[in-house]
A protein has these predicted regions:
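Extended substrate/RNA-proximal surfaces in nucleic-acid metabolism proteins
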Residues: 57-169
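An N-terminally biased module of ancient metal coordination in phosphate/nucleic-acid-related enzymes
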Residues: 1-80
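Active-site metal-binding loops of divalent metal-dependent hydrolases
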Residues: 14, 50-51, 88-89, 145, ...
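Metallo-beta-lactamase
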Residues: 15-24, 155-160, 170-173
């Protein structure tokens, strides 16, 4: 008899951290989100509050404190789920300077960065920005690529970005 394999997933793009930008307003909603994630087989969640210069700019120290408190509160809710902190970076021309100055924009101190673009981004801009980020030594994770018109018009472009070394993230729901 064959043994069934249980697959577990990692959610690398989550606004589960309550009280921060797109996150829930309260801990009760975060707890419910954790339970749903667990039921769906997720065993690691990277909380990725937005980083958008001039808009979503909560300081890193405050964000880290909020995250550590959240992590402590969630310990008894779903102890099997590992929590990590990252950011969802809205790409602008200033981001390269910010990346150079602030390593805390990565996913849990790794070389991976989650990058979001405007839905009508031009493919040439998207490609150039990915190349620039990679030249700095980071691995770009392109957030919700299914939202970008240039890619919707030609899905081969997503493969081209992947072949450059970018990671492609799509929303599941």
């Amino acid at each position: 008899m064959r043994k069934l394999t249980t697959f577990h997933y990692v959610d690398i793009h989550s606004h589960i951290l309550y009280g921060v930008d797109d996150g829930p307003d309260n801990i009760e909603t975060s707890i419910e989100m954790m339970k749903i994630a667990y039921d769906e087989g997720i065993r690691k969640i990277v909380a990725t509050p937005h980083y958008h210069p001039g808009k979503c700019t909560m300081g890193y120290e405050q964000l880290r404190r909020n995250f550590e408190l959240f992590k402590e509160q969630m310990k008894d809710v779903c102890p099997e789920i590992e929590l990590a902190l990252g950011r969802e970076i809205y790409y602008t021309s200033d981001i390269l300077d910010d990346l150079e100055a602030q390593a805390h924009l990565t996913m849990e101190d790794s070389k991976y960065i989650l990058i979001e673009y405007h839905p009508t981004v031009e493919y040439s801009y998207l490609r150039t920005s990915i190349s620039n980020v990679m030249q700095m030594g980071y691995t770009p994770v392109i957030a919700h690529i299914e939202r970008y018109m240039c890619v919707l018009e030609d899905w081969k472009l997503a493969l081209e970005l992947k072949n450059m070394g970018a990671v492609i993230q799509v929303n599941a729901g």
